[in-house]
Curated annotation (Swiss-Prot):
This is Malonate-semialdehyde dehydrogenase 1. It catalyses: 3-oxopropanoate + NAD(+) + CoA + H2O = hydrogencarbonate + acetyl-CoA + NADH + H(+); 2-methyl-3-oxopropanoate + NAD(+) + CoA + H2O = propanoyl-CoA + hydrogencarbonate + NADH + H(+). Belongs to the aldehyde dehydrogenase family. IolA subfamily. The keyword Transcription regulation does not apply. Pathway: Polyol metabolism; myo-inositol degradation into acetyl-CoA; acetyl-CoA from myo-inositol: step 7/7. InterPro entries: Ald_DH/histidinol_DH, Ald_DH_C, Ald_DH_CS_CYS, Ald_DH_N, Aldehyde_DH_dom, MeMal-semiAld_DH, MSDH_GmP_bac. Transmembrane segments: none annotated. Pfam families: Aldedh. NCBIfam families: MMSDH (TIGR01722).
Length: 491
């Protein structure tokens, strides 16, 4: 008897309020990284699909931009309530597609919802300013307006939170939006789009086109897309920034990271170990705010390494849907193999392997265990490169200043953390570290939605960051009106 073939569902693009098939004949499998099960197929869409979506967005923008700001805000409040209603379903979709455990997925959903809540404050955010007397009988006012059709290119590692940095604010401020999500996590995006429609967002205001290079290039080249928001790797981010800038678009490109954490002798050791283990190994290290390097003062180093090793070895690895699991898989086989190659490179270059994640590789999914290196130096590949996996390097230092100097040598400058009870050390750290987001006695210094996600150096290309007031400026343009009203006689 022959084998039974189970047909896998093909995901569609979301354009002008409808799910429609892509014009492509090329599809890619979407795989549950914990089980290697094919859960659907995603289209590698074409520039023609981008063109269709942009036309729909452009048409919708003409009406949506004229909708009263409080009305747009109420729709965003509706959306927030629907996301709250379906939080558990959203979290499960994230775990199935991405692999992170359910607790982390629920946290991501909550951060996405918080971004929607911030965007729902559009009436306050869009307010301009004025000066009633700049000369005799002359006043001036500054107004904000949406910029048009904008595009977002999002990664696989935060399939809800990162898109929610982008489209809720953009559409709340009156723009129309085209999202290219990661082709590895399409099901979560389907749910986000359906809930937007349920919330009352008109057809064409929000559109989704799945794909790879052709879709990205179609967005970067299209003259009717006025701005591009990107989150992803450094090489792709550089390309997006250059290409979009050449085509005279606004661009914000949030790229790679190599986040350093400094642990001083006076730190609460157990607290530091718990937070650093979560920051380094949570989400399988696949996040731009992961702790990648720890510089620890010599007086506490032996105890720190021993406790961190024990903590890493105690972490439960497995399918994120299962109770008690902390560490899920990396996203794909090639990511696992790339991580193994970095571990081998670290050993080859002379680092000491304290905890070897290769010993916990599983055939069931794309799993690799927590990995810790000691005796790492700044000329080693594992210190320089963004590995994007549960791999942590430890360097012993004499003092805070040496730890800061090491961190500042990195080409990346997304985040940095300090564990200490010394307020003077905190101030010195804040004033001398080259990084855009700092954490004191915490492992992941990602800010709330109302502050900018403010990476420095090769972690960000652009002027206006995602989130906070920067995002309002990014998605709006200003119009200044100077008016003269000659004073009549009221005598």
């Amino acid at each position: 008897m022959g084998e039974t073939t189970v047909e896998v569902r093909k995901v569609k693009n979301y354009i002008n309020g409808k799910w429609i098939e892509s014009s492509t004949s090329l599809y890619e499998d979407v795989v549950n990284p914990a089980t290697k099960e094919v859960i659907c197929q995603v289209p590698l869409s074409t520039k023609a699909d981008v063109e269709y979506a942009v036309e729909a967005a452009k048409t919708a923008f003409a009406k949506w931009s004229k909708v009263a700001v409080p009305r747009r805000a109420r729709i965003l409040f509706n959306y927030q309530q629907l996301l709250q209603r379906d939080k558990e379903e959203l979290a499960r979709l994230i775990t199935i597609e991405n692999g992170k455990n359910l607790t982390e997925a629920r946290g991501e959903v909550q951060r996405g919802i918080e971004n929607v809540e911030f965007a729902a404050g559009a009436p306050s955010l869009m307010m301009g300013d004025s000066l009633p007397m700049i000369a005799t009988d002359v006043e001036a006012s500054n107004y904000r307006y949406p910029i048009g059709v904008v595009g977002g290119i999002a990664p696989f590692n935060f399939p809800m939170m990162v898109p929610c940095w982008m489209f809720p604010m953009a559409i709340a401020l009156g723009n129309a939006f085209l999202l290219k999500p990661s082709e590895r996590t399409p099901l979560l995006t389907e749910k986000l789009a359906d809930l937007l429609t349920e919330a009352g967002v008109p057809d064409g205001v929000f559109n989704v086109v799945y794909g790879a290079h052709d879709v990205v290039n179609g967005m970067l080249e299209h003259p009717d897309i006025k701005a591009i928001s990107f989150v992803g790797s450094k090489p792709v981010g550089e390309y997006v920034y250059k290409k979009a800038s050449e085509n005279l678009k606004r661009v914000q490109a949030l790229t790679g990271a190599k986040n350093h954490t400094i642990v001083l002798n006076d730190a609460d050791l157990d607290d530091a170990v718990t937070n650093i283990a979560g920051a380094a190994f949570g989400s399988a290290g696949e996040r731009c705010m992961a702790c990648a390097v720890v510089t620890v003062e010599e007086g506490i180093a032996d105890a720190f390494v021993a406790k961190l090793k024990a903590k890493a070895e105690s972490l439960v690895m497995g399918n994120g849907l299962d109770d008690g699991v902390f560490l899920g898989p990396v996203i794909r086989e090639e990511n696992k193999n790339r991580t193994i190659a970095y571990i081998e490179k670290g050993v080859e270059e002379g680092a000491t392997l304290v905890c070897d994640g290769r010993s916990r590789v599983s055939a069931d999914g794309y799993f690799i265990g927590p990995t810790i290196f000691e005796n790492v130096t700044t000329d080693m590949t594992i210190w320089k490169d963004e590995i994007f996996a549960p791999v942590l390097s430890i360097i012993r230092v004499k003092n805070l200043d040496e730890g800061i100097q090491i961190a500042n040598r990195s080409e990346f400058a997304n985040g940095a953390c300090l564990f200490t009870t010394n307020a003077a050390a905190v101030r010195y750290f804040r004033e001398n570290i080259d990084a855009g987001m700092l954490g004191i006695n915490l492992g992941v210094p990602a800010p709330m939605a109302f502050f900018p996600f403010s990476g420095w150096k090769s972690s960000f290309y652009g002027t206006l960051h995602a989130n906070g007031k920067d995002s309002v400026d990014f998605y709006t343009r200003k119009k200044v009106v100077t008016a003269r009203y000659p004073k009549p006689s009221f005598d």
